[in-house]
Amino acid sequence: MSFRSAEGVSIMQALAMTVAEIPVFLYSTFGQSIFSQLKLSPSLKKVLFATALGSVALALTAHQLKRRGRKRKQTLGKEAQKPVGIPEQLLRSSRPASLKRGPVPARQMMSPSTRSNDTLSGVSSIAQSKHSSSSHSIASMRVPSSPNQSVNAGAAWEAEPVAEEPAVGEDANAENLYLMGMELFEEALRKWELALNIRHRSHSRASASNSQGSELVERHSPEVRNHQFAERLETLLHRAYHLQEDFGSTIPPDSLLADLESEGTLILPTLGSSHPIQDDDATTVTSDDSFFSAAELFETFSLEDSFHLLKPAALYEEALSLVKDGDVACRSLRTELLECYSDQDFLAKLHCVRQAFQVLLLDETHRMFFMETGKQMISGLLVKANKSPKAFLESYEDMLQYTQREETWPVSKMELEGRGVVCMNFFDIVLDFILMDAFEDLESPPSSVVAVLRNRWLSDSFKETALATACWSVLKAKRRLLMVPDGFIAHFYVISEHVSPVLAFGFLGPHQHLSEVCTIFKQQIVQYLKDMFDHDKVRFTSVPSLAEDILRLSHRRADILMGYLGIENLPETNGALPKSPCQAESGNLDASGQQD
């Protein structure tokens, strides 16, 4: 053992001596010839040679260490650029991590188009958070270039598996794409609104300059093109708002969209009609109260700034000026029901329609047409429900006789004004107060009535009797509270006692055929009113032209309803059931059989 250790020591000594003799060997071989020309002492020559040799060795060592460090950095960079292994199901769902691990209100999702500086900041954060310039989709996320994170990232993802079915992931992915598309659509709306606002500002400046009498002829052609462009842009915006209202709520409430909305991620910046649209780098809104729909955003623009008629309408323009002055009132706004552009648009058209009906009803022929049409429609509806129209016809005649007496008009006006009717006009009394209110009441029936009609253990006849009894009791109770026991409202309640149970059972009852009849009746009435408020269906140029168009629409809708109800001639007051074409044909066959 000692021999082996001694042998090892001798080998190490020999190697050390060999290494130590290398500089001496190099000096004796090369150093003497190099330093022979220098007049120095031998010891100084050895020192200079050792210094030069050490410097060369040190430089070679530093170069080698530098190359090794560069290779190590390249290796670490390649490892850091590799994406972390994200589960496939999480990629499909594309949900932020905050939605998976727990509710974090400060987490936000931005629009995928925020990578461009030209986009508006449509989505903002609730709390202070860092906004990235890239898309915030979970599929494009990368882990920072840290060695520690790159080593343990895969284990972290594997430690938190996502329990989600593949089909659910695909649905969530589709819903996320829908959400991104809606965000882009809202951004397009903002751009169009900005373009329209700029166009109106330029148009106002151009008109101001033209009013001073400078360059009127030269500006005429560009102004016409600008006006046409603004009209097309307004039409596009109007259709886009309707499209967003129709398809803005098609995602189920338990989906990704509902989750995002619950965290307040769809927040739009506030916008006022008197302030210009903010730039892209403007401060975003951080309040949940700033969320509003496209319809509300559309209403913030004034009518004079965003709506121009495509065809001349002097009567409408005059009515619109009265509306702006606050001289036109109504009982209830029907803007959405009649598909008007805004409340001002509805009021202006309402004022025109009132004037047209005043002109129409000056003619005795037109008055008789409207009276007979109403009687025939309600009688035909009762016949479709297998009810006798005798009592209704008698009450209807009493009502007409009461309204034709001029001494009753002040009392009727007082009663109707107490119900909110602001104008004694055919539209306000018959179409709005009677028909539209009846349709609205049938859309929200009492819960007790709905419970009876949905009870499967009750027969249809019992349901119809119970509903009729409820209507009669309510109407009789209202009649006892009237200030004028034999006035206009009292006569109206008498008619309602015969018509309301049939309409209620038709709209709410189990009979499909009667429900279809009542639904078509309502659709025709509502469409008749919509056509009356449509610039494409009637002319708002003058009162006679509008009255002529309304009369034409009235005849057309009356023909449609009479043809659908299958009744041509109705009895006046004899109470006999009107015969449908089938019943008339069978009656003729019976008569011919008796003659034979």
UniProtKB/Swiss-Prot annotation:
Residues 67-158, 576-596 are annotated as: Disordered. InterPro entries: Miga. It holds the Pfam family Miga. One of its GO terms (molecular function) is protein heterodimerization activity. Keywords: Membrane, Mitochondrion, Mitochondrion outer membrane, Transmembrane, Transmembrane helix. Residues 110-123, 143-152, 583-596 have a biased composition (Polar residues). It is a multi-pass membrane protein. Regulator of mitochondrial fusion: acts by forming homo- and heterodimers at the mitochondrial outer membrane and facilitating the formation of pld6/MitoPLD dimers. May act by regulating phospholipid metabolism via pld6/MitoPLD. Homodimer and heterodimer; forms heterodimers with miga1. This is Mitoguardin 2.
